[in-house]
């Protein structure tokens, strides 16, 4: 089956084990991924949620994943009903952004088109950290969705309150997807102003509005020689001047 496996590893060993609070968690996660690679699984990798505590491990962890031929997925702190958090925040935005900048340049220097588009996704994470409107429209509940462990189908896991379109235990897919309840939830998502930037909602948008990330990739990979700078972002001017 086409199943991708990601294990959350929040940095190098000391950082990861401190954040996760799991004894020897880094080695356990790393060895699990290594075993899957040795077994020939085609789609395994790290998933890292970047924050103040671990941002300096971002590029080193990418290098570990890259050297092993694994995928490297990134995210940053979000608040939502699903995460049961309302106080997640990044204090030193510039420090975190600078480490994303380093990662973006690493990705742009690769020979992988997939990584070039991941560079754009990480550019979007910087934009999100600074509290801006998301780079692309969100169409969750229309062209993508999330299924929670209780079989509730919801638009995504980033909303302030849970909005259920239906439940797969009680309804067929067609009944659920075309129900009045689903239509009401779509109206809610249309008005959502959270501007979250997670791969679950960003990836479908990047495919639908491909010309936007496509032009960004052409500009940075080919016209700028694979280089990206935080100074391109007008909203960062004040922070960059004060550093």
What function would you assign to each model-found segment?
Residues 3-10, 14-154, 158-167, 209, ...:
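Radical SAM enzyme [4Fe-4S]-AdoMet core and its adjacent flexible, acidic
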Residues 1, 13, 20-23, 66, ...:
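Generic secondary-structure transition motif, activating predominantly at the C-termini of alpha-helices
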Residues 135, 157-243:
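Flexible mid-to-C-terminal extensions adjoining Fe-S/redox cofactors in radical SAM and related proteins
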């Amino acid at each position: 089956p086409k199943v991708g496996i990601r294990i959350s590893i929040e940095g190098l060993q000391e950082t990861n084990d401190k954040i996760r609070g799991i004894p020897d968690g880094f080695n356990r996660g790393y060895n699990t991924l290594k075993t899957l690679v040795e077994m020939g699984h085609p789609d395994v990798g790290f998933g890292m949620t970047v924050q103040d505590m671990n941002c300096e491990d971002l590029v080193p962890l990418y290098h570990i994943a890259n050297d092993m031929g694994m995928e490297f997925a990134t995210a940053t702190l979000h608040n939502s009903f699903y995460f049961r958090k309302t106080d997640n925040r990044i204090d030193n935005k510039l420090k975190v952004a600078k480490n994303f900048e380093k990662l973006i340049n690493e990705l742009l220097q690769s020979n992988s088109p997939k990584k070039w588009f991941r560079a754009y996704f990480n550019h979007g994470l910087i934009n999100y950290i600074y509290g801006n409107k998301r780079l692309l429209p969100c169409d969750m509940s229309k062209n993508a969705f999330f299924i929670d462990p209780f079989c509730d189908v919801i638009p995504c896991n980033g909303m302030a309150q849970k909005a259920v379109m239906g439940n797969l235990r009680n309804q067929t897919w067609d009944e659920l997807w075309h129900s009045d309840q689903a239509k009401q939830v779509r109206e809610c998502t249309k008005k959502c102003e959270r501007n979250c930037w997670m791969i679950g909602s960003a990836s479908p948008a990047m495919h639908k509005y491909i010309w936007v990330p496509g032009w960004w990739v052409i500009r940075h990979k080919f016209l700028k020689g694979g280089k990206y700078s935080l100074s391109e972002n007008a909203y960062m001017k004040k922070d960059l001047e004060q550093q």
